Amino acid sequence: MRFSYAEAMTDFTFYIPLAKAAEAAGYSSMTIPDSIAYPFESDSKYPYTPDGNREFMDGKPFIETFVLTAALGAVTTRLRFNFFVLKLPIRPPALVAKQAGSLAALIGNRVGLGVGTSPWPEDYELMGVPFAKRGKRIDECIEIVRGLTTGDYFEFHGEFYDIPKTKMTPAPTQPIPILVGGHADAALRRAARADGWMHGGGDPDELDRLIARVKRLREEAGKTSPFEIHVISLDGFTVDGVKRLEDKGVTDVIVGFRVPYTMGPDTEPLQTKIRNLEMFAENVIAKV
């Protein structure tokens, strides 16, 4: 089992010392959140809070995903950084390919490209991208990012994007794992075609159903390649629970030590955060 340290919506000056501490403590990876901006007016709902409220995000600091990962990659040597998750279809896929390929090449293939479709029309409006057909759009984006990060010539002609034969360098020396986030069946189907699935949290029984579904979709598609399953689960906080998750096929447990979905700034001191992640490493990571 691998363990991924999660922190978000906190003082952005904490990220560098937290990444260093997570690497020293034995975590395999760290999640990197993504958000472009917060709208003044919105009636759309957040899918991972009970009431759909997302006002807690107002004013929360989000360093741009690629910028933050580059900074953290420069001060670590082993820790992988998993985007959790990048709102891919609101961005130009060729630019994402250049950013992801450059980043992975620069920090030694330590990038997991977690992607998803933003559920909020405001993100699409801000970036000048139609909200309609976002599922088909992300499918094309994934194919383009894959193709343009190989270091070979690649072309693509689809409904939304037309890429002439093009080569991007530098390219990473290993393929960038593409991990798809989301609980909808369309997201699970997309994940089954990719390199992994990222769980957004929720009911334990629902997690079992989602894991079984994505496994079944991979079997139906004849997929036998290595596949990552990243989950948020209370079972991830005990040795016995981790073993149960392993038995279900989970490869990566995402662990955080506070609930970020709260109003106002995060007031937890840096040293408390570091001690929390160290205690978990001592009590769980070191024993599995």
Swiss-Prot record:
It comes from the Bacteria. GO terms for molecular function: oxidoreductase activity, acting on paired donors, with incorporation or reduction of molecular oxygen. InterPro entries: Diverse_substr_monoxygenases, Lucif-like_OxRdtase_Rv2161c, Luciferase-like_dom, Luciferase-like_sf. GO terms for cellular component: plasma membrane. This is Uncharacterized protein Rv0940c. The lineage of its organism: Bacteria, Bacillati, Actinomycetota, Actinomycetes, Mycobacteriales. Pfam families: Bac_luciferase.
